[in-house]
Amino acid sequence: LGVCYGMMGNNLPSHSEVIQLYKSRNIGRLRLYDPNHGALNALRGSNIEVILGLPNVDVKHIASGMEHARWWVQKNVKDFWPDVKIKYIAVGNEISPVTGTSSLTSFQVPALVNIYKAVGEAGLGNDIKVSTSVDMTLIGNSYPPSQGSFRNDVRWFTDPIVGFLRDTRAPLLVNIYPYFSYSGNPGQISLPYALFTAPNAVVQDGSRQYRNLFDAMLDSVYAAMERTGGGSVGIVVSESGWPSAGAFGATQDNAATYLRNLIQHAKEGSPRKPGPIETYIFAMFDENNKNPELEKHFGLFSPNKQPKYNLNFGVSERVWDISAETNSTASSLISEM
């Protein structure tokens, strides 16, 4: 499990304090949305695995020529390797023909290819996978999960991405938020189904039973990729979370329940793909410069580094008990069982 380190706040701790917090909480993975050198320098020697974002604003530039991709990889990857364990480069976040990022869609695959080539030229092709992070707006049919498919009007965009990932043996990064499905459709989707607390199967899909929406969403993307020749492509859940305030269903209790259950569930996998799911929780901190209001309330921590929830963040047989002291003493790490 990992946690996304967003920086859209004017009151957040220093980069070195943040990385120290990751280490003291035994959080072994981190997602960065852009190659912030302050954060990358703080990550040196930490052994934390990183999803490094190439931001949307740079995608067109990177697509326009190999020299730009080479420069970007040298400056933001090679200069920090191997002190920083960059595992994936996410070229763009939630670029989609059906959202406000549609102007970037034609540059997505050329940018992926250029960064992939530049990483290979840098001698890091076996160490770093190149992918992109997508959201569920690309999925047309998601019910039942086995019938998952990409929207027909985005296939021109998704098919080449899936083909690229298949050919380079990289996973697709997917942002999965049961919260938004639930809050947009509470009449059809029950809160327990969204929070992993439904006592029984809610959806019967052939021989597969679904007791939570997260699995149903995840498996619908697997099915969609299979339909487009990407049956061998894995998925990394690059964001998932629940807001604690700011909108319908966004409460401290709901967020705590979702996060606690997500952390546990990520070890188990989905009906279609059992086994641990590499998952990144959004986000490390409440970020007060984000909009709309609910976007300010996704943090596991307040900007003063105080935990908002009591969670067991089980990494390498350790428990993260944030009801314990919030400094970096060993007493906040209790061994599991």
Curated annotation (Swiss-Prot):
Record-level Gene Ontology MF annotations: glucan endo-1,3-beta-D-glucosidase activity
Organism, as annotated: Solanum tuberosum
Main EC class the enzyme belongs to: hydrolase
Pfam family membership, one: Glyco_hydro_17
EC number: 3.2.1.39
Catalytic activity line of the entry: Hydrolysis of (1->3)-beta-D-glucosidic linkages in (1->3)-beta-D-glucans
Family, similarity comment: Belongs to the glycosyl hydrolase 17 family.
Function: Is thought to be an important plant defense-related product against fungal pathogens.
Keyword Glycoprotein attributed: yes
Protein name per Swiss-Prot or TrEMBL: Glucan endo-1,3-beta-glucosidase, basic isoform 1
GO cellular component terms, A-Z: vacuole
Active site feature: 94, 239
Propeptide regions on this chain: 315-337
Glycosylation sites: 327
Induction, as annotated: In leaves, in response to infection, elicitor, ethylene, or wounding.
PROSITE patterns: GLYCOSYL_HYDROL_F17
Gene Ontology process terms (BP): carbohydrate metabolic process; defense response
